[in-house]
């Protein structure tokens, strides 16, 4: 199993470095305090960078950390120093794109907390026990939709439903303005 792409953890932190959704897949951080110390250190090292348009990568304590910021959420994927950073970047890209779609392009702390169940479903579809399962955002969304995202409709039906909901919101605003 050494050749299977794997990750050590996936972190979603807010703009203050506080946990929104985290999942660890290795025993490199055996206690809650060591996990929180790692999160704090990674956040401190990356917060002054501008990883808003593309993912950035940093070597941190013999780990590759690939990260990206979307609005007030910071996404991190950590892998060992032997891991391929392009695979880590594709994990981050697929996961963050799936979250962006699920939260309807409103990727911020409040929306993430309100939809924490969907975020953890995405995590489960991307990585299982540290082994990378899926990196394509559409495939992740299809699998999550099979778990009950907006009923049991297909992704196309969900897009249509989302478009109709947005149109209703705009129509209601125009009537009451």
Curated annotation (Swiss-Prot):
It is found in: Cytoplasm; Golgi apparatus membrane; Cytoplasmic vesicle, COPI-coated vesicle membrane. Pfam families: Clat_adaptor_s (PF01217). PANTHER family: COATOMER SUBUNIT ZETA-3, ZETA-COAT PROTEIN. Keywords: Cytoplasm, Cytoplasmic vesicle, ER-Golgi transport, Golgi apparatus, Membrane, Protein transport, Transport. Its main location: cytoplasm. It comes from Oryza sativa subsp. japonica. This is Coatomer subunit zeta-3. Oligomeric complex that consists of at least the alpha, beta, beta', gamma, delta, epsilon and zeta subunits. Belongs to the adaptor complexes small subunit family. One of its GO terms (cellular component) is COPI vesicle coat. The coatomer is a cytosolic protein complex that binds to dilysine motifs and reversibly associates with Golgi non-clathrin-coated vesicles, which further mediate biosynthetic protein transport from the ER, via the Golgi up to the trans Golgi network. Coatomer complex is required for budding from Golgi membranes, and is essential for the retrograde Golgi-to-ER transport of dilysine-tagged proteins. The zeta subunit may be involved in regulating the coat assembly and, hence, the rate of biosynthetic protein transport due to its association-dissociation properties with the coatomer complex. InterPro entries: AP_mu_sigma_su (IPR022775), Coatomer_zeta (IPR039652), Longin-like_dom_sf (IPR011012). Disulfide bonds: none annotated. It comes from the Eukaryota. Gene3D superfamilies: 3.30.450.60. It is a peripheral membrane protein. GO terms for biological process: intra-Golgi vesicle-mediated transport; intracellular protein transport; retrograde vesicle-mediated transport, Golgi to endoplasmic reticulum.
């Amino acid at each position: 199993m050494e050749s299977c792409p794997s990750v050590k953890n996936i972190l979603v932190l807010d703009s203050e470095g506080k946990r929104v959704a985290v999942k660890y897949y290795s025993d490199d951080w055996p206690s809650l305090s060591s996990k929180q110390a790692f999160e704090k250190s990674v956040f401190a090292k990356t917060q002054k960078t501008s990883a808003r348009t593309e993912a950035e990568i940093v070597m941190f304590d013999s780990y590759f950390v690939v990260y990206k910021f979307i609005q007030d959420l910071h996404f991190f994927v950590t892998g060992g120093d032997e891991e391929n950073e392009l695979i880590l970047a594709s994990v981050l890209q697929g996961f963050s794109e799936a979250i962006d779609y699920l939260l309807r392009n409103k990727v911020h702390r409040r929306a993430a907390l309100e939809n924490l169940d969907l975020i953890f479903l995405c995590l489960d579809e991307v990585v299982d026990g540290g082994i990378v399962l899926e990196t394509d955002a559409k495939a992740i969304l299809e699998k999550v939709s099979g778990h009950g995202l907006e009923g049991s409709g297909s992704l196309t039906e969900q897009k249509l439903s989302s478009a109709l909901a947005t149109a209703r919101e705009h129509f209601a605003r125009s009537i009451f303005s």
